[in-house]
């Protein structure tokens, strides 16, 4: 049997309460389980998972991520609409966490870093019928206003539209 999808991610972080505050504020995760000072398990609002993100605290002296080394580059969290992407971008900007924005033609994305410097992507999936034939994944500048003008702020795609993956 083949893998169907990623079920959850677990991150090592320095301090659990700071990370919980960040992820619940910016990405609107809810706390499913909390082990004070040690770990937390967060759930996306519309998931059927017990948790989608685990956070394990290592302490303030732990080294941060090292860009350019072998390992995980980033996780991509999917939102359902361009309106949700815009709102998430505003929350990330208000926390000075936003580090980039890209149009991958098949998705519209913001890139950010959490308080421990762990990079992640928040993306909206372009409707499959509008994907380019070439599969070009090179990043292009994101024009979110133009995307909203084209598809509207409330068009649900991906998991929000019932896609199993």
Q: Model-found features: residue ranges?
A:
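Vicinal oxygen chelate
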Residues: 4, 13-18, 69-70, 75-119, ...
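Short glycine/proline-enriched turns and hinge-like loops at secondary-structure junctions
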Residues: 35, 66-68
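Short beta-strand/turn micro-motifs at beta-sheet edges
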Residues: 60-66
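Short, charged/polar surface micro-motifs in flexible loops or helix N-caps
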Residues: 47-50, 60, 80-85
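Short active-site oxyanion
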Residues: 7-8
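Core segments of cupin and vicinal oxygen chelate
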Residues: 11-57
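Acetyl-CoA-dependent GNAT
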Residues: 57-60, 125
């Amino acid at each position: 049997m083949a893998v169907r999808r990623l079920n959850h991610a677990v991150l090592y972080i320095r301090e659990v309460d700071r990370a919980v505050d960040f992820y619940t504020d910016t990405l609107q995760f809810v706390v499913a389980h909390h082990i004070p000072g040690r770990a937390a398990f967060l759930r996306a609002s519309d998931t059927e998972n017990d948790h989608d993100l685990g956070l394990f605290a290592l302490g303030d002296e732990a080294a941060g991520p090292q860009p350019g080394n072998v390992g995980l580059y980033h996780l991509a969290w999917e939102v359902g609409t361009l309106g949700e992407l815009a709102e998430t971008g505003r929350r990330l900007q208000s926390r000075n966490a936003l580090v980039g924005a890209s149009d991958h033609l098949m998705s519209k994305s913001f890139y950010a870093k959490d308080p421990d410097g762990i990079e992640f992507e928040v993306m909206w999936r372009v409707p499959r019928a509008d994907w380019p034939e070439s599969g070009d994944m090179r990043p292009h500048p994101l024009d979110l206003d133009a995307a909203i003008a084209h598809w509207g702020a409330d068009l649900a795609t991906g998991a929000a539209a019932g896609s199993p993956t």
